[in-house]
């Protein structure tokens, strides 16, 4: 197997038992593909599919005027290039967007002859701005990165359910059906406790369902014919003959003697009819049974009965037979009658009973009844009734089932075709009611609405399309009204279309929708996870309060689609989920997961993606089934999931149809990063997966020694690590950029074969963590496409590295690790292992005020020179200045109005005659509790305002850097082009050239070297092909120079034009502070198994427990944190990490002893190839083996994939390999090598029993004590209650709550209590008085009336109760 450039530098030893057939798909594919389908930016106009923007335009256009003479058609749309790139948008606080322009055609017909076209106008119209997605799947909105989270909602279609017996006290199951469209009115059908079937539209008042059936044109006779089978009777003068249908009699009690045609009694009266009786009647050839008169009474007629002579209706369908009716029928000579067959078991009389409750006469009456229900109080005119009825379910404008909805309706109603009209049809309604009646009759099953076949995912593209469509339909209404005037006023399309509604709909969605979220950017994993999140909340979804247990629970269909582990704790549990590692969406928006095909018990390499619905048809085995080397299932019974319930059963191998592609396919990206996940309790695994997203990137990333093999995938797919887009040779590297000369094979002919990667340096993330990329390649390195060439935040050699590998001992230590506290060695702090850089952005704006403009200046009165020392002449701090809380960073003065002077000021004025300054100091100062180094300053100036020197110098600097970039590019491009030319020309025959080159001379390197490079183009090669290529290169270089000049001009224009600032703002300055945070007591740390704790003490190295060879532990954890929490994974990780560290030490010792490459190769072979996945070490050269060994000195990285990880014996093998007997003895290891005799650092005595010691990957989480530490003396108060505000952001106080008051009461500390509830809180006069007293040197309190008492009095008065405080 071939290793990539970075992979062979440090190979991760994998314990996976199964080779992967199917690679993990690109992690951000759902987001990026969805939005690409929405925009269809690069698709040719003619080939655009009807989805996204195209579908929205097609749905709204053509727009026809009210009189029908003018209409506007849509031709095509295109998106312009974005005016600023992503980085510029982030700096300037703009949205990264593109202008949408649509070409529309206005067609006006002739008034006299409406079929004749009078004129056609075609024009391109601006339709608003559409935000573009960045390459990593996020959006930049007003300068901040946001993510649109996908939504899991109920799929359109038809659903059948029952109330589980909760509605009615008897516990009777009430069945209901609901037809949910993608857009339009919901149609519900439901039984009530009396078994009458009702329908309702949009949850309005319910009406008998027969009204709906009549309104679609069915008569009562037809309704009964659809829902019942009939009994046929022939009337006799006394009694009647009934047509004998055997099945209908079984189980009934005979109400009279039943005889066969020969008159022999087969069933006696009051006996139950069984199968034998029916067989006897059948074998006797019975066709008719004679029944007495009372058998007919109470039966219901199926059809209207008309007098054959007079045409008079004798009885209506659905009438009950009485003696009177029978007499009437006999008198009229009616012989044949049909009645409804019903029984209590599986043929209930529901529709017949419903018809009786319905008093509408015909179709018109039924439609009027529906109109009255929808529009109560409006007069039902014929047109209005008809229009409303059509619009409810039959009009494409207001009703849309969508492709998914139609497919789901057809499959649920058992139709063969998956396609059909996008509106409801009469058949749909009728079939749904039939199916519901069958359910009530006990045939069929209700739907499970939590099944992932009934829930689909709406991605960014679809959500944006819905918003765009909403905006476009508002435009449509305006256009319709103005189209009438188009002809008379000679208007053009752009006069008719106003793009505001579209822009505002899109802006509102991206800016403030519940699904548009501020991107979690703490580390690369949090970005990836946020983009793969699936939320059931949001518009059209559930709400936290109403979501029950079932919706939140793990469902069998989540397998391989949604992660059962990763979900937030708290009110959102189960409503916000994460996409499983291999899952993807199908065309309909349902989640699919890949399975390997199995044929006759043998695995094939075919991988199929199955949705939850399709999977229900197959038997699917688990990935850990035992295989032989040819891929045959060898166990007698294999555990597999089958049936719609996906129950796990044991089946024989020949029945297996599919098998999982990988053991990790059931979990999400975050959960698959937890090694030994299979040994952790699910609750702790959940915490572990969630806490990895809060890990702060450390100064130096350190790859986990024990990983799972997914680290590289996450790091690369997140976009943090830079990948080479094309292979080539590294030409130039510095901290800011990597330049690669592309391989000839990958370069397109005639283009410049140079890729320049500008790296991100010290940039602030959304969570104020630091994003910084470092190059990993040297000049001359050969890289292939997809290789990692630079590391980003929290990545180490292209692998995700969220924390640091620590030597951990599990033992109590003087109570400092009580209750999950963590004891840390000073060495960890001294080596800056957990030091992180946080970047704070502080900004100040100078506005235009009523009293005049604010000014950013260095000239501030009454500020000491020491305070101004950091400011330059423009009043802005220098880069590199180290600032503390309270220091001025940008000087700013605001004009203030004439104020009342104090007597002192009056005196000064009288003496010095100067006018005291009329400006107040409103400078930007460093907030309390913050200190750091200024690393960047940006100045934005409004158009038309003169720039200060600082702003100008920033622009010059930026242009200089850009010019340098371009010159570099040009140098490489030209150098590269001339190298290619040299390879092309040397040895070719020329017809002439500079320096009097003779015709027919072969070109040599020496001749070319003598020429000035630009004169090479004057050579006239003999071969036409070569001449053409020479000319092409010349044109390409000139074009490139021209392009570069244009690009530079464009950049200069962008930088020198004024900035777009909010109204009233003249100038804005942003200062970026880098704050270094070392680990300190109070910081939260965690492992990857949900083992979290707070640092309690940083202990001197000499006091830490140490091993026999003197190595002290880095961290001491409490062993009591393991058993009750059942996350044993951390212990296994510690053992395997210990082996990894030991193997690294062995390799390091060999390198120190300058061992031969062959020896090292042998040891590496033992490590890598004796169990688990085999590595191809033979393909590496000796130099590469030595470089690999050098990188393994600190520990051999292991991968133990989720559910397919290292077994106990493998960990033992690795420990034995790492610590041969001599080393084990020296370190004081026990026989198992998993525990060590440790010594107390303070006394030097050995602890009385061995201690588990090893290496664990520990994270520092984003809950830092520096961000939480806060104190207040005086500060802001709440307006109404006058009590201090709460929280650090508001500079609030600590709440002295109910329980604290009880504590003081219990101690009887009455004066303390009085002070707490009055002068320290909301006694306004008392507060000021205390201040006065302290100033005067008196330490006394005058407690008065708390303001909240007045609030209470006012509240009571507002209830209309007069209350007064009487003082006596």
Swiss-Prot record:
It comes from the Bacteria. GO terms for biological process: DNA-templated transcription. SUPFAM superfamilies: beta and beta-prime subunits of DNA dependent RNA-polymerase (SSF64484). InterPro entries: DNA-dir_RNA_pol_bsu_ext_1_sf, DNA-dir_RNA_pol_bsu_external_1, DNA-dir_RNA_pol_su2, DNA-dir_RNAP_su2_dom, DNA-dir_RNAP_su2_hyb_sf, RNA_pol_bsu_bac, RNA_pol_bsu_CS, RNA_pol_bsu_protrusion. Belongs to the RNA polymerase beta chain family. The keyword Glycosyltransferase does not apply. It is an enzyme of class 2 (transferase). Keywords: DNA-directed RNA polymerase, Nucleotidyltransferase, Transcription, Transferase. The RNAP catalytic core consists of 2 alpha, 1 beta, 1 beta' and 1 omega subunit. When a sigma factor is associated with the core the holoenzyme is formed, which can initiate transcription. Its EC number is 2.7.7.6. It catalyses: RNA(n) + a ribonucleoside 5'-triphosphate = RNA(n+1) + diphosphate. This is DNA-directed RNA polymerase subunit beta. GO terms for molecular function: DNA binding; DNA-directed RNA polymerase activity; ribonucleoside binding. DNA-dependent RNA polymerase catalyzes the transcription of DNA into RNA using the four ribonucleoside triphosphates as substrates. One of its GO terms (cellular component) is DNA-directed RNA polymerase complex.
């Amino acid at each position: 197997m071939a290793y990539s450039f970075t992979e062979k530098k440090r190979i991760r030893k994998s314990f996976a038992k199964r080779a992967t057939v199917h690679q993990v798909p690109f992690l951000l594919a759902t987001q990026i593909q969805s939005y690409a389908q929405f925009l269809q930016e690069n698709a040719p106009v003619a080939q655009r599919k009807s989805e996204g923007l195209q579908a929205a335009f097609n749905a709204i256009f053509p727009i026809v005027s009210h009189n029908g003479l003018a209409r506007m058609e849509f031709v095509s749309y295109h998106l312009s290039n974005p005016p600023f790139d992503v980085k510029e948008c982030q700096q300037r606080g703009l949205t990264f967007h593109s202008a949408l322009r649509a070409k529309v055609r206005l067609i006006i017909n002739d008034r006299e002859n409406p079929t004749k076209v009078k004129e056609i106008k075609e024009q391109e119209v601006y339709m608003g701005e559409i935000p573009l997605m960045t390459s990593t799947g996020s959006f930049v909105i007003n300068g901040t990165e946001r993510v649109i989270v996908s939504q899991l909602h109920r799929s359109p279609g038809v659903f059948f359910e029952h109330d589980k017996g909760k509605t009615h006290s008897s516990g009777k199951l009430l069945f209901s059906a609901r037809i949910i469209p993608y857009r339009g009115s919901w149609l519900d059908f439901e039984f009530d406790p009396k078994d009458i079937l009702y329908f309702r539209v949009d949850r309005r008042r319910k009406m008998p369902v027969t009204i709906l059936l009549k309104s679609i044109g069915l008569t009562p006779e037809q309704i009964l014919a659809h829902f019942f089978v009939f009994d046929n009777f022939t009337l006799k003068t006394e009694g009647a003959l009934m047509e004998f249908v055997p099945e209908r009699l079984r189980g009934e009690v005979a109400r009279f003697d039943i005889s066969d045609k020969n008159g022999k009694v087969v069933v006696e009266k009051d006996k139950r009819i069984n199968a034998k009786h029916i067989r006897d009647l059948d074998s006797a050839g019975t066709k008719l049974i004679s029944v007495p008169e009372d058998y007919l009474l109470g039966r219901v007629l199926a059809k209207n009965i008309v007098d054959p002579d007079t045409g008079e209706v004798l009885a209506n369908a659905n009438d009950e037979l009485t003696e009177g009716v029978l007499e009437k029928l006999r008198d009229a000579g009616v012989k044949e009658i049909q009645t409804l067959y019903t029984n209590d078991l599986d043929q209930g009389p529901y529709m017949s009973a419903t018809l009786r409750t319905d008093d509408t006469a015909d179709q018109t009456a039924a439609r009027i009844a529906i109109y009255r229900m929808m529009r109560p109080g409006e007069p039902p005119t014929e047109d209005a009734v008809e229009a409303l009825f059509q619009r409810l379910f039959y009009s494409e404008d207001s009703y849309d089932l969508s492709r998914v909805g139609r497919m789901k309706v057809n499959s649920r109603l058992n139709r063969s075709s998956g396609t059909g009209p996008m509106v409801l049809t009469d058949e749909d309604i009728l079939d749904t009611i039939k199916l519901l009646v069958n359910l009530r009759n006990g045939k069929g099953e209700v739907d499970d609405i939590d099944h992932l076949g009934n829930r689909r995912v709406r991605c960014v593209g679809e959500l944006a399309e819905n918003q765009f469509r909403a905006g476009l339909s508002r435009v449509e209404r305006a256009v319709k009204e103005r189209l009438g005037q188009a002809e008379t006023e000679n208007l053009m399309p752009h006069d008719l279309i106003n793009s505001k509604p579209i822009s505002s709909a899109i802006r509102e969605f991206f800016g403030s929708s519940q699904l548009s979220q501020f991107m979690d950017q703490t580390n690369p994993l949090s970005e990836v996870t946020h983009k793969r999140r699936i939320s059931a909340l949001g518009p059209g979804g559930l709400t936290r309060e109403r979501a029950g247990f079932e919706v939140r629970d793990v469902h069998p269909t989540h397998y391989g689609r949604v992660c059962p582990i990763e979900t937030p704790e708290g009110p959102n549990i189960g409503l916000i989920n994460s996409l499983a590692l291999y899952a993807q969406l199908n065309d309909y928006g349902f989640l699919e997961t890949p399975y390997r095909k199995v044929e006759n018990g043998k695995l094939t390499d075919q991988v199929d993606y199955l949705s939850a619905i399709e999977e229900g048809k197959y038997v699917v085995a688990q990935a850990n089934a035992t295989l032989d080397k040819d891929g045959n299932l060898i166990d007698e019974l294999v555990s597999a999931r089958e049936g719609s319930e996906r129950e796990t059963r044991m089946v024989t191998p020949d029945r297996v149809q599919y098998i999982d592609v990988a053991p990790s396919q059931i979990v999400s990206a975050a959960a698959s990063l937890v090694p030994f996940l299979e040994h952790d309790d699910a609750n702790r695994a959940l915490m572990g997966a969630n806490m990895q997203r809060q890990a702060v990137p450390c100064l130096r990333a350190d790859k986990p020694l024990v990983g799972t093999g997914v680290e590289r995938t996450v790091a690369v797919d997140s976009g943090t690590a830079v990948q080479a887009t094309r292979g080539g040779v590294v030409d130039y590297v510095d901290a800011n950029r990597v330049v690669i000369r592309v391989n000839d094979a990958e370069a397109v002919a005639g283009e410049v074969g140079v890729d320049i990667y500008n790296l991100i340096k010290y940039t602030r993330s959304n969570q104020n963590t630091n994003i910084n990329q470092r190059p990993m390649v040297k000049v001359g390195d050969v890289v292939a496409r997809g290789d990692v060439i630079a590391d980003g935040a929290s990545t180490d050699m292209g692998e995700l590295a969220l924390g640091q590998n620590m030597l951990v001992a599990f033992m109590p230590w003087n109570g400092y690790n009580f209750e999950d506290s963590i004891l840390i060695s000073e060495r960890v702090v001294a080596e800056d292992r957990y030091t992180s850089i946080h970047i704070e952005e502080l900004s100040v704006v100078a506005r235009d005020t009523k009293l005049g403009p604010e000014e950013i200046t260095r000239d501030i009165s009454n500020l000491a020179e020491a305070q101004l020392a950091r400011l330059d002449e423009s009043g802005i701090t220098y880069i590199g200045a180290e600032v503390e809380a309270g220091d001025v960073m940008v000087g700013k003065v605001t004009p203030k109005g004439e104020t009342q002077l104090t007597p002192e000021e009056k005196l000064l004025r009288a003496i010095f005659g100067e006018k005291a300054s009329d400006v107040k100091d409103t400078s930007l100062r460093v907030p309390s509790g913050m200190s750091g180094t200024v690393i960047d300053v940006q100045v934005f100036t409004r158009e038309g305002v003169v720039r200060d020197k600082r702003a100008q110098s920033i622009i010059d600097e930026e242009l200089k850097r850009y010019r340098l970039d371009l010159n570099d590019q040009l140098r490489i491009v030209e150098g590269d082009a001339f190298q290619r030319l040299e390879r092309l020309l040397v040895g070719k025959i020329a017809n002439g050239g500079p320096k009097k080159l003779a015709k027919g001379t072969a070109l040599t390197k020496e001749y070319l070297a003598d020429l000035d490079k630009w004169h090479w183009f004057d050579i006239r090669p003999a071969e036409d092909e070569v001449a053409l290529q020479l000319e092409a290169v010349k044109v390409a270089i000139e074009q490139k120079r021209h392009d570069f000049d244009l690009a530079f001009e464009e950049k200069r224009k962008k930088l020198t034009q004024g900035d777009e600032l909010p109204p009233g703002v003249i100038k804005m300055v942003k200062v970026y502070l880098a704050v270094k945070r070392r680990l300190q007591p109070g910081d939260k740390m965690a492992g990857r198994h949900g083992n979290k704790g707070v640092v309690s003490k940083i202990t001197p190295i000499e006091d830490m427990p140490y091993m026999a060879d003197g190595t002290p532990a880095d961290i001491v954890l409490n062993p009591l944190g393991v058993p009750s929490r059942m996350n044993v994974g951390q212990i296994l990780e510690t053992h395997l990490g210990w082996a990894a560290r030991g193997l690294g030490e062995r390799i390091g010792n060999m390198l120190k002893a300058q061992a031969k490459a062959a020896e090292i190769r042998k040891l590496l072979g033992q490590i890598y190839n004796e169990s688990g996945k085999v590595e191809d070490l033979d393909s590496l050269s000796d130099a590469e083996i030595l470089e690999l060994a050098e990188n393994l000195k600190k520990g051999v990285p292991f991968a133990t994939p989720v559910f397919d990880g290292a077994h106990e014996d493998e960990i033992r093998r690795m420990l034995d390999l790492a610590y041969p007997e001599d080393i084990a003895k020296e370190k004081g290891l026990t026989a198992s090598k998993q525990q060590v005799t440790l010594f107390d650092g303070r006394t030097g005595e050995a602890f009385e029993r061995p201690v588990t010691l090893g290496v664990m990957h520990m994270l520092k989480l984003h809950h830092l004590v520096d961000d939480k530490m806060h104190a207040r003396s005086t500060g802001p108060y709440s307006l109404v209650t006058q009590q201090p505000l709460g929280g650090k952001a508001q500079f609030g106080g600590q709440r002295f709550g109910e329980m604290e008051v009880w504590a003081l009461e219990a101690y009887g500390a009455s004066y303390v209590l009085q002070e707490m509830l009055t002068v320290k809180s909301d006694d306004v006069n008392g507060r000021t008085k205390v201040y006065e007293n302290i100033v005067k040197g008196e330490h006394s309190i005058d407690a008065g009336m708390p303001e909240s008492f007045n609030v209470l009095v006012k509240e009571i008065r507002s209830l209309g109760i007069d209350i007064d405080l009487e003082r006596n």
